[in-house]
Amino acid sequence: MKKNFLAVLFALALCSPTFAQWKPAGDKIKTPWGEQLNPKNVLPEYPRPIMERQDWKNLNGSWNYAITKKGEPAPNNYQGEILVPFAVESSLSGVGKTINEHQELWYQRTFDVPSAWKGKQILLHFGAVDWKADVWVNDVKVGQHTGGFTP
């Protein structure tokens, strides 16, 4: 069964190389760990050990991204690729751009859901969303989040 994770909108309040050619955007906070990062197998461990289950799929890796003016519709074209789970501002994302309060950041990824999951409930886990996200699957808005770690 083909699931198209059409777009995840991260509207940040404060706020391209191809996958095979991924590289950090600059040398900010360079570490041995970052130098050993494999963009084809990014942080493969289960993200929430307390909820670990046998059937799961890691969506870390290369996603399309676009930065648009706040309030614009979903983009038809994306500006490049971003390495998830790293923030767009970080070097390890491969982007290294800062988003301001007049902009929104869109992520897009297509993936296959294993046929054995047909008819089962599927949990999409986001390790962090910095302020606001609208989640779309197959052109259908399936959820939203507002908050983050702000007091």
Where are these regions (language model features)?
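Generic detection of short hydrophobic beta-strand segments and adjacent strand-loop junctions
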Residues: 57, 82-86, 109-111, 145
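Generic structural signal for beta-strand residues in well-ordered domains
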Residues: 7, 13, 56, 75, ...
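A short, polar/charged loop/turn motif at coil->beta-strand junctions and beta-hairpin connectors
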Residues: 23, 27-29, 53, 57-59, ...
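N-terminal pre-domain segments of enzymes
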Residues: 21-57
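Bacterial Sec-dependent N-terminal signal peptides
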Residues: 1-22
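Core domains of carbohydrate- and sulfate-ester-processing enzymes
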Residues: 59-104
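Extracellular/oxidizing-compartment recognition motifs
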Residues: 22, 27-30, 37-39, 88, ...
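Accessory beta-strand-rich segments of carbohydrate-active enzymes
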Residues: 64-68, 97-151
